[in-house]
Amino acid sequence: MMTKLVINPVAFQLGSLSVKWYGIIMAVAIVLATWMAISEGKKRQIISDDFVDLLLWAVPLGYVGARIYYVIFEWGYYSKHPNQIIAIWNGGIAIYGGLIAGLIVLLIFCHKRDLPPFLMLDIITPGVMAAQILGRWGNFVNQEAHGGPTTLHFLQSLHLPEFVIQQMKIGGTYYQPTFLYESFFNLIGLIIILSLRHRKHVFKQGEVFMSYLLWYSVVRFFVEGMRTDSLYIFGIIRVSQALSLVLFIATIILWIYRRKVVKPKWYLQGSGLKYPYTRD
């Protein structure tokens, strides 16, 4: 007999303030991503201050972008309830929106700081992947972003820990742990990228980032098809699947173009900046 063990989304109380596991997990994910970027940045002649400053802009604006993206594709609801548009505490963010906003911030930041944008993207990519891997466990605690109904027998056949199986029982029904599928396959992708990143003549600058785009677009396309909370276009097309398909094709085109026309430096050549430099 399985013991009922459901994780409370609230980790602890500070007076009237509820500190939730989701927030704790996201905070740890951000710290991990920053540490990974700073550690790799030193090897590519980028100082830590640039990553910290980028973080201070990219994280809050990334959340804004994630919210705007979600609101746009749920406009039928928010047009009737405009007071809920900023109520992010009630849920409703989309990772693709956060990635798009973060990319825009990074491009502007690199232009202002005279930093190589593709190299910066390469450096932060593994940290972003690690943050996504952890972040999906926040969805797990909240019992959200799951797939369709399934059976206890199926979940047990995956040899999942009991606490995962029980957390996937919502309202008396077991659901597919799509958070786990995405987290697991992103971990595989991260391991592959980390194992290849420091090998000579594997990645040109920008290709660590583009490898992530290719990998994640495939993972998200298939996982999205299982989810029950997808955003839709015209009521029939899943937004994330459509975007994943476009992203996959566009990334291949960009990769070929940069290899044949731009001919960028190898990733291991770094920024070429005199290191350590200082910022006024």
Curated annotation (Swiss-Prot):
It is an enzyme of class 2 (transferase). The chain crosses the membrane at residues 21-41, 54-74, 88-108, 176-196, 206-226, 236-256. It comes from the Bacteria. It is a multi-pass membrane protein. GO terms for molecular function: phosphatidylglycerol-prolipoprotein diacylglyceryl transferase activity. Its EC number is 2.5.1.145. It is found in: Cell membrane. Pathway: Protein modification; lipoprotein biosynthesis (diacylglyceryl transfer). Belongs to the Lgt family. This is Phosphatidylglycerol--prolipoprotein diacylglyceryl transferase. The lineage of its organism: Bacteria, Bacillati, Bacillota, Bacilli, Lactobacillales. The gene is lgt.
